[in-house]
């Protein structure tokens, strides 16, 4: 088993991973369409399209972290699109060039994600705590809500950036503060090992923004 063989196998594995990521993106879009047909009254995921992208730069040790992915305007990527993996939310596209995009990481003080408890659908806001790339926080969560260590946190239906029920993490620690809980979340995704991601495009986000703007103007 020579050095040349090792290099050849490594390159083959990279190409295989890229192919699998692209195929998974296609399957996600197809599956969401099928799920919507079957569970139309409960599932809005048909409103999203998925594109695969590779992370080519990433930071985790700053107060405000960003990552770069290898898809841009020529691939249909736009500002405001969500970025996820099969282990959770990664961030939101901030800007794009022809072939690349900068993503505001979940590990960034500017990022807030609408979440809910999977077991009872109670809503909250998730933000990074600024210290550990494996953890995030939910603050000012009502203390009368049933929540326990190990409970799963997923995305809520309030955002049109991410599909509902994308996994995020589990409850690691619960602290009480004047009638509220401050909750520490262990993230499923390891941001130090990001490779392939999925860009999430909402087909109805413009319509939603226009409708909600008309209400705010009243």
Task: Annotate each PLM feature.
Residues 1-74, 78-218:
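Extracytoplasmic/periplasmic terminal helices and flexible tails
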């Amino acid at each position: 088993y020579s050095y040349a063989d090792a290099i050849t196998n490594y390159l083959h594995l990279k190409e295989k991973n890229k192919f699998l990521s692209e195929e998974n993106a296609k399957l996600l879009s197809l599956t969401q369409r099928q799920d919507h047909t079957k569970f139309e009254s409960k599932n809005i995921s048909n409103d999203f399209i998925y594109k695969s992208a590779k992370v080519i730069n990433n930071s985790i040790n700053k107060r405000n972290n960003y990552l770069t992915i290898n898809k841009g305007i020529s691939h249909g990527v736009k500002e405001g699109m969500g970025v996820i993996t099969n282990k959770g939310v990664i961030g939101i596209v901030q800007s794009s060039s022809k072939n690349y995009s900068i993503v505001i990481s979940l590990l960034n003080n500017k990022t807030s994600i609408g979440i809910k408890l999977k077991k009872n659908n109670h809503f909250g806001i998730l933000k990074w705590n600024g210290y550990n790339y494996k953890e995030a926080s939910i603050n000012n969560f009502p203390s009368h809500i049933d929540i326990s260590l190990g409970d799963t946190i997923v995305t809520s239906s309030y955002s049109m950036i991410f599909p509902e029920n994308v996994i995020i993490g589990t409850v690691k620690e619960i602290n009480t503060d004047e009638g509220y809980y401050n909750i520490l979340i262990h993230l499923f995704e390891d941001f130090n090992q990001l490779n392939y991601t999925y860009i999430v495009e909402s087909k109805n986000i413009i319509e939603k923004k226009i409708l909600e703007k008309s209400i705010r103007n009243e």
